[in-house]
């Protein structure tokens, strides 16, 4: 009897068992399990709406479907740029997790937006962590250098902001890194709208793949950057992740050119981790 009472007292004084950790809601079943997923975002609510955006999104989706390297998910809003579960709204779905995917589902983002953007501070933190900490990919299209211009950390991630642009015209290019997949056979003259960059751009922070040939620029054009540094396509590592920026695609036509499509496809593959390339920053590779 004494032993029984002592045992009861011990049981009454024992510390409660720790609470089980909260279980994060699971997303819907994955119909593309085992395949790379690319989130294509063209949120231009606060910026210039390039007429080529619809064609660009369709081309990116088509390249993934035809090559089999990735599945593209097309959005014209930024809702999915979050690490939080996505819940619905309205009478039917309010407070319920819906089948929209958050960043956990994707392997890279292809960003075609422009302007100051609609991201909340938490979404901005989630986007940076998606690349820097999670080791995912970020591909920026033509207008990505004029997006989020009041967000310094974004400019640091992509390598710089656009300072201005030349009118659409044929210009001469130098293939700076012919070993980067898709770059070797790019034509040395190509018609598009070319940009020139400003801070935080620094050639020591990026690996240039294609650039304008400064020897073929007019004095007026060269005055935009007297150092003659006019990158057109570049790549860089950002933390554990990969960033690939191409400024091609102001109009529809470049998206139909095999050389541009090949360059974008190979950039996507690299950002997804399907291929490797040396992206040592320019000043360190000399």
Language-model segments: which ranges?
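Short alpha-beta junction capping motif
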Residues: 38-41, 100-151, 240, 246
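Short beta-strand segments enriched in small/hydrophobic residues
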Residues: 35-47
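Glycine-rich, highly charged phosphate/nucleotide-binding loops
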Residues: 20-21, 76-102
């Amino acid at each position: 009897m004494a032993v029984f009472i002592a045992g009861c007292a011990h049981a009454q004084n024992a510390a409660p068992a720790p609470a089980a950790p909260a279980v994060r809601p699971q997303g819907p079943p994955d119909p593309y399990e085992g395949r790379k997923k690319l989130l294509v975002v063209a949120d231009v609510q606060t910026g210039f709406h390039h007429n080529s955006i619809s064609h660009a999104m369709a081309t990116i989706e088509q390249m993934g479907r035809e090559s089999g390297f990735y599945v593209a998910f097309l959005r014209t809003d930024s809702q999915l740029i979050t690490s939080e579960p996505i819940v619905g709204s309205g009478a039917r779905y309010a407070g319920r997790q819906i089948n929209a995917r958050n960043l956990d589902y994707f392997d890279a983002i292809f960003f075609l937006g422009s302007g100051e953007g609609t991201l909340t501070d938490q979404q901005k933190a989630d986007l940076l962590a998606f690349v820097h900490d999670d080791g995912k990919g970020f591909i920026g299209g033509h207008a990505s250098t004029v997006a989020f211009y009041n967000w310094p950390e974004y400019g640091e991630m992509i390598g710089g902001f656009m300072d201005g642009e030349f009118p659409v015209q044929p210009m001469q290019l130098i293939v700076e890194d012919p070993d980067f997949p898709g770059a070797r056979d790019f034509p040395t003259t190509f018609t598009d709208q070319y940009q020139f960059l400003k801070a935080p751009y620094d050639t020591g922070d990026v690996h240039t793949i294609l650039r304008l040939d400064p020897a073929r620029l007019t004095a007026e054009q060269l005055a935009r950057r007297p150092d003659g540094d006019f990158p057109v396509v570049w790549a860089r590592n950002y933390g554990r992740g990969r960033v690939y920026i191409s400024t091609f695609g102001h109009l529809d036509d470049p998206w139909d050119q095999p050389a541009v499509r090949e360059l974008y496809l190979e950039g996507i593959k690299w950002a997804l981790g399907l291929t490797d390339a040396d992206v040592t920053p320019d000043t360190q590779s000399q």
